[in-house]
Amino acid sequence: VLELRETIAASDALLVVTPEYNGSLPGQLKNMLDWASRPRVGAVLREKTVAVIGASPSPSGARTAQADARRVLTRAGALVIDSELVVPSAHARLGAGDRLGDEELALAVREVLLELRRAVRPAARDAALASIHRGRPSSGSCTAAPSFRRRTERSPR
């Protein structure tokens, strides 16, 4: 748990990719998010910029699990970007090993990652400026993130 908390604290942003088990996020993921959200003061998820992707062999693409993860992360104080990606029929769309199976999916994942990166940069700048105004060096934590309303959804070919 300490290593998890240190890794999240040292990151600029977090990408959560979740499958869907029985209409919700997996218990292991929920447990990890719970550990990262405590204690409330000093929680490593607080003000961390996060993107969530859902992938499932079902036609829904883990839409419910993705919504649950977004709700839990928001409740923990994370800054969850609005850009979403659900991957229905993931078993047919993922390639062997660490490769994405189709170009359309690869581009959709890249779009989410670019949105995440764009959300982190202004937040880090705002934190640095606020820190300068207070007369102390920046801790690098995020204080704000822009809102992205575009929904990115890909269906199988």
Question: Where in the sequence are the language-model features?
Answer:
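Short intrinsically disordered, low-complexity coil segments enriched in acidic
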Residues: 1-7, 109, 155
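Helix-loop-strand module that forms the ligand-binding subsite of alpha/beta enzymes
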Residues: 2-76
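Glycine-rich phosphate/pyrophosphate-binding loop and the adjoining helix
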Residues: 79-157
